[in-house]
Amino acid sequence: MTNGKSTVTIHMGASLDGFIEKKDASVDWFNTSDSYPDGAPDPDVEAFLKTIGCYLMGSKTYELALRLGWIYGDTPTIVLTRRDLTTDRKTVEFYNGDLDLLLGRLREQYGSVWVAGGAQVAAELIRLKLADEISISILPILLGQGTRYFEYFQQEQHLHLKGATAYRNGVVEVRYEILK
């Protein structure tokens, strides 16, 4: 958390071997049929989503979300892109500029900033020390190949474990503070 007011959290769903999508860019493996009876009840996703002030994502993640079915509702969504994209969604804003200025505005305006992807966006936010936390939902699958979430990250970064929860659906959520 920065200044006690806002948090920028990088979130990802990943296979146990660290991939966020298959080689063909599919994410059909996100639906797990695993069962872990000793796990915590599956989280109340709807209640959690109400705590997010805005989403931040790259254009590839945005385009994937449109193809799969928009799950972000009317929550403000900022899409980082160098391309000239258009949308009919009133809550989507395209941005190409200084990330420090953008994050300052988003922290002030929305408080909770949830980085929904992708790998290049996450790497840049960590490199610039603009993100506060990383939340990884590890799914019970090994993909062997595809896109790794931290594929573009090229430096050492120390983290502090904030918590871990194993859920009944076999997903393990791990939360880290990014040490600055």
Q: What do these predicted regions represent?
A:
Residues 1-180:
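Enzymes that bind and transform nitrogen-containing heteroaromatic metabolites
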